[in-house]
Each structure stands twice: as structure tokens, then as C-alpha cells.
């Protein structure tokens, strides 16, 4: 469950290290986001010579949450930290590598490029 002002790790090599959620996309009354949802983020911490700078505003897709994600078979999966991947306006990742596992639910949300770059899909 990602709310506005939630801090997330960045799971790609776009240059950002930490981002903060500004807005949850998908309706004016929508308050929370889960895995596979698109949010608007502000870069709070970035590395030098990266593709993005501190203060930049981008869209991101959530790939890991500490809140459990329930599946149809009754199982649940959760992670230690919240993480997101920065995407451009065409819904493609800005970075060329993905760090850490991502969840299978991204496949249904049409983020196949992120799944193909990820080292592990849970």
C-alpha cells in the first residue's frame, strides 16, 4: 500500500536511489497503490552522472511492496522494502537494468519489458 509521501527505493539503473510518491494515478479519489500501479514520484536522492537528477518528477511502476500482495491461489507475497522502477511517458523503463526480484502481477499490467529485464520473477 503506497500512499502519497511514501519513500521508495529505485530498482533500476536510471540514476535515482530514492524517490517519494507524489500522486497515485488512476482516478481522482484513489488513495493507495499496490504492485503494478503507476504513480508520480519526485527524485529525492540520485547518483552523479545519472539519467535523472534530484528534484525531477517522473512516473514509476511499483515492483515490490512491504504490504502483502494476495494471489488468486490464496498465497501472499511481501518484501522487506517498497521499490519502484522509473518509466517514461510511453510506459517503458528509463534504466536498462532491473535490480532484485519483481512480482508476476506485472505481466497482467503490460509491463513485459520490466519482467524481461528482471533477474527473478516471483
From Swiss-Prot:
Gene3D superfamilies: Ribosomal protein L14
Organism name: Granulibacter bethesdensis (strain ATCC BAA-1260 / CGDNIH1)
Molecular function terms from GO: large ribosomal subunit rRNA binding; structural constituent of ribosome
InterPro entries in the cross-refs: Ribosomal_uL14, Ribosomal_uL14_bac-type, Ribosomal_uL14_CS, Ribosomal_uL14_sf
Name of the protein: Large ribosomal subunit protein uL14
Highest taxon above the source species: Bacteria
Record GO biological process: translation
Subunit and partners: Part of the 50S ribosomal subunit. Forms a cluster with proteins L3 and L19. In the 70S ribosome, L14 and L19 interact and together make contacts with the 16S rRNA in bridges B5 and B8.
PANTHER family reported in the protein's UniProt record: 50S/60S RIBOSOMAL PROTEIN L14/L23, LARGE RIBOSOMAL SUBUNIT PROTEIN UL14M
Main function: Binds to 23S rRNA. Forms part of two intersubunit bridges in the 70S ribosome.
A GO CC term assigned to this protein in UniProt: cytosolic large ribosomal subunit
HAMAP family linked to this entry: Ribosomal_uL14 (MF_01367)
Alphabetic keyword roster: Ribonucleoprotein, Ribosomal protein, RNA-binding, rRNA-binding
Family indicated by similarity: Belongs to the universal ribosomal protein uL14 family.
Amino acid at each position: 500500500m503506497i500512499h502519497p509521501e511514501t519513500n521508495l527505493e529505485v530498482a533500476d539503473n536510471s540514476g535515482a536511489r530514492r524517490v517519494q510518491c507524489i500522486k497515485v494515478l488512476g482516478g481522482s479519489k484513489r488513495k493507495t497503490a499496490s504492485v503494478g500501479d503507476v504513480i508520480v514520484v519526485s527524485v529525492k536522492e540520485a547518483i552523479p552522472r545519472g539519467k535523472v537528477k534530484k528534484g525531477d518528477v517522473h512516473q514509476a511502476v511499483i515492483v515490490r511492496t512491504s504490504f502483502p500482495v494476495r494471489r488468486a491461489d490464496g498465497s501472499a507475497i511481501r518484501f522487506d522494502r517498497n521499490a519502484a522502477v522509473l518509466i517514461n511517458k510511453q510506459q517503458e523503463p528509463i534504466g536498462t537494468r532491473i535490480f532484485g526480484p519483481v512480482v508476476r502481477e506485472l505481466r497482467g499490467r503490460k509491463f513485459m519489458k520490466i519482467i524481461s529485464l528482471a533477474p527473478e520473477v516471483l
